[in-house]
Each structure stands twice: as C-alpha cells, then as structure tokens.
Amino acid sequence: MADQNERAFQKQFGVNLNRKVKPGVTKKKILRRYRDVGLGFKTPREAIDGTYIDKKCPWTGDVRIRGRILIGVVRKTKMQRTIVIRRDYLHFVRKYSRFEKRHRNMSVHCSPAFRDVEHGDIVTIGECRPLSKTVRFNVLKVNKGQGAKKSFKKF
C-alpha cells in the first residue's frame, strides 16, 4: 500500500485496489502500473518495486516525455519532489568577438524513484507538459557529481 500522508486517499490511476482474489493464490502481489518512457532511458527499480504514488512521475504517472532532452547540475533540493538545476552556456558578443558565461536556473520535477539526489549531481531531464507554473521538465537520469569542481563547467 502506498504511503498515505496526504488528505486524500493516494492511489495509482488505472489500478483496481478492490480486485477479487483468485482461489488458491496465497502470495499477495502488489498492484502497480509502470511503463517505459522510451528514448533509451531505463525504468528505475524503485519505480517498479516501490510503493510511492506520484501522478507527475514519467514511469508511474500520466506524464509523457516529448520534446527536448537537456542536462544540468543540481543546485537546490529544498522543495518537495522538485529540484532546481543550473544550465551553463556561452553567449557570443559580436562587438568584442568573445564569449561570455551565462546560466539559467530551471525548476524540474524529481520523481521519488530517485531517492538520493544531492547538490552537485548531473541530471538528464526531458520535456513534458506544464506540471505547474514553472515546472515543464522531469528528471530521467541521475549521475553522481564529482566533489569539488569549478562553478562554471560545460559537461
């Protein structure tokens, strides 16, 4: 059963929790729906075996990944199920024929399938429909970051 820590009963869409049990079956199987997002990304083991309920998860929810696939570095993990990533890039200034450093911060939905996302990790994100006012991307893969490094670094 899922963790019930909200006011409304948490259940996965499309799963009947009141299903009749076949006679002679003793092992109770956890009813869970998951799918493959495609694009070469593997479904995390936590999404298959876990008990979390997240309607915005690309594996267990009703969100489709389409559009852009981007990479960024985790900056903040203080929100619930949402992280802030930083994307660094270079902008060319024609007057001086030089590049200047710029960056963008993006709010990204992080599924509970990724338990230990920390500051400095490199994440791959995929575009989806708008999930809130500022969130339009979902975390698809997490690579652990290397300890101390420069603040501006192109992957």
From Swiss-Prot:
Disulphide bridges: none
Alphabetical UniProt keywords: Acetylation, Ribonucleoprotein, Ribosomal protein, RNA-binding, rRNA-binding
PROSITE patterns: RIBOSOMAL_S17
CDD domains for the chain: Ribosomal_uS17
GO biological process: translation
Domain of life: Eukaryota
GO molecular function: rRNA binding; structural constituent of ribosome
Residues where N-acetylalanine is found: A2
Gene Ontology cellular component terms for the protein in this record: cytosolic small ribosomal subunit
Similarity section: Belongs to the universal ribosomal protein uS17 family.
Protein name listed in UniProt: Small ribosomal subunit protein uS17
Natural source organism: Drosophila pseudoobscura pseudoobscura (Fruit fly)
Gene behind the chain: RpS11
